[in-house]
């Protein structure tokens, strides 16, 4: 396939040794949740800083101050700094970017970001078990909460949303298509360069070969390929 050939040519070109990718995991997760992406990007020549932080311990503001400075320090001396986030990791980054500038800023891929807040927090946030599991940062993610206060994103941002759910109960709360945790509509944000919906779930999307391929494509080219599929990826890997 022509698409597979194009993707093969793309991946055959190593990233600049001076390109760095900062990764931020989601709520109640850890850096290991992004291990597949981390290892793939490293194989493609990127320097990767997979930041780990205790996502349920503090507010988004405090978490961002703890996670971003050391991650960015690890990228010092590189040509460009890119970002890949999952879920609430995007809100940490948006808060940080609202108050700081990143020298030599590259591209950003947000996976399942609650950019317009979460209807689940609206419905369940007042319940004690929810607060215990998700902490102060989780409580900030209501549809009238912090995400809505942060404004448009910067140039070079691509968003991937999922449309498959592993939680039918949550999906009855979420409006329209959703990934089991975040509605597709809530992932959209003013200023984004691209938005892609894929049949993947919130919890496991970062391990999907197609998602990994789309992340790599966007970091390299600033665009997604909606037609990229498992056949293309298989042909690429077995060529």
What do these predicted ranges mean?
Residues 1-7:
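Sec-dependent signal peptide recognition
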Residues 4, 16, 76-77, 102-103, ...:
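Short hydrophobic "helix-edge" motifs at membrane interfaces and signal-peptide entry regions
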Residues 12-14:
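N-terminal signal peptide c-region/cleavage motif recognized by signal peptidases
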Residues 19-27, 31-32, 36, 42-154:
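Serine-dependent carboxylesterase/thioesterase catalytic core
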Residues 39-43, 184-187:
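Short hydrophobic/aromatic-rich motifs at helix boundaries and adjacent loops
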Residues 98-239:
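Helical cap/lid subdomain of alpha/beta-hydrolase-fold lipid enzymes
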């Amino acid at each position: 396939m022509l698409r597979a050939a194009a993707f093969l040519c793309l991946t055959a070109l190593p990233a600049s040794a001076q390109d760095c990718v900062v990764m931020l995991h989601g709520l109640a997760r850890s850096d290991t949740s992004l291990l597949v992406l981390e290892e793939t990007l490293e194989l493609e020549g990127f320097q990767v800083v997979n930041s780990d932080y205790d996502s349920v311990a503090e507010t988004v503001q405090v978490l961002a101050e703890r996670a971003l400075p050391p991650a960015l320090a690890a990228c010092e001396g590189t040509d460009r700094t890119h970002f890949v986030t999952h879920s609430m990791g995007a809100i940490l980054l948006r808060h940080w970017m609202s108050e700081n500038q990143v020298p030599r800023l590259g591209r950003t891929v947000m996976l399942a970001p609650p950019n317009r807040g979460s209807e689940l927090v609206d419905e369940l946030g007042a319940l004690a078990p929810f607060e215990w599991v998700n902490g102060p940062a989780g409580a900030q993610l209501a549809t009238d909460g912090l995400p809505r206060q942060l404004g448009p994103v910067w140039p070079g941002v691509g968003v991937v949303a999922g449309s498959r759910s592993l939680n039918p109960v949550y999906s009855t709360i979420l409006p329209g298509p959703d990934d089991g945790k975040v509605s597709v509509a809530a992932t959209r944000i003013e200023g984004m360069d691209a938005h892609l919906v894929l049949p993947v779930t919130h919890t496991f999307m970062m391990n999907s070969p197609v998602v990994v391929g789309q992340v790599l494509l966007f970091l390299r080219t600033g665009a997604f390929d909606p037609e990229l599929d498992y056949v293309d990826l298989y042909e690429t890997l077995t060529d």
